[in-house]
Regions:
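Short, conserved turn/kink motifs that form compact alpha/beta structural patches or helix kinks used as
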Residues: 30-231
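Short, intrinsically disordered N-terminal pre-domain segments
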Residues: 1-20, 230-231
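Short Lys/Arg-enriched alpha/beta "domain-start" segment
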Residues: 15-24, 30-36
Length: 231
């Protein structure tokens, strides 16, 4: 028996375990930047444990990673699992190993300026407000999710938005006298169809705004270091 068949049998076994332990989740596979839940693939049973495989450890605050027990033959890294009370995205489906999932506690959307400020003018405080962010819909365009319009609510991508480690300085704020702030870590799936850049601003479903200080893409998805900003 080759490795691929063993891998498939492991996923089949996890699927059988989920039939006893798990709840129903819709598998959503993003195909557009504007709405990650427009493409439902299937519904399956899934159970999640705090990376111990024995279901003995409780999850603690600030820990978004879980192991998922479900039939991985029906899913891909980057898929969302949307349940009645919780949403996860699949961070990685590595050969013969547990399926790594990230619990989502917020949804986020992002706009970018229609006309970027020339680098030669980036130090001119009269060009944009201090934060460098757009103040109106006419100055920006949706690139991830969608802004509220026409009486319709905003649409965001489910993400993990938790306190990070250490303090950060807003890369788009005025350079002189800018205080450091407590950082945030935002995690999004590899299925996000864009590349994050320092200075990007994300807005969550509570209206909080986060300026990206650094972005890392790996086989487990996006990790963004960000600070909360106020304009």
């Amino acid at each position: 028996m080759d490795a691929a068949k063993i891998h498939a049998k492991i996923y089949a076994g996890r699927g059988k375990a989920a039939l006893r332990l798990g709840l129903l989740y819709d598998v959503m596979r993003p195909v557009t930047a504007s709405d990650p839940f427009s493409n439902k693939v299937t519904t399956l049973n899934a159970a999640f444990n705090n990376t111990d495989n024995k279901y003995l450890k409780a999850n603690h605050p600030g820990e978004p990673l879980w192991y998922g027990d479900f039939d991985g033959r029906q899913t891909l890294a980057g898929d969302y699992l949307a349940g009645a009370d919780s949403t996860y995205f699949i961070a990685a489906q590595q050969q013969l190993l547990p399926i790594i999932c990230v619990e989502c506690n917020r949804t986020v959307r992002m706009t970018r300026p229609v006309v970027p400020v020339p680098e030669s003018e980036s130090d001119n405080v009269s060009v944009l407000p201090y934060s460098g962010m757009c103040q109106s819909a006419d100055e920006s365009v949706d690139v991830l999710g969608s802004s509220p319009q026409g009486g319709l609510p905003a649409v965001g991508w489910p993400a993990s938005v938790l306190f990070g480690k250490g303090k950060l300085r807003n890369a788009t704020a005025l350079k002189a006298g800018t205080p450091e702030q407590l950082g945030w870590q935002i995690m999004l799936p590899v299925s996000v169809p864009l590349v994050f850049q320092p200075g990007d601003v994300l807005v969550d479903d509570l209206g909080n705004q986060f300026s990206v200080s650094g972005a890392e893409l790996s086989d487990t998805g996006w990790r963004l270091q960000a600070i909360e900003v106020h304009i």
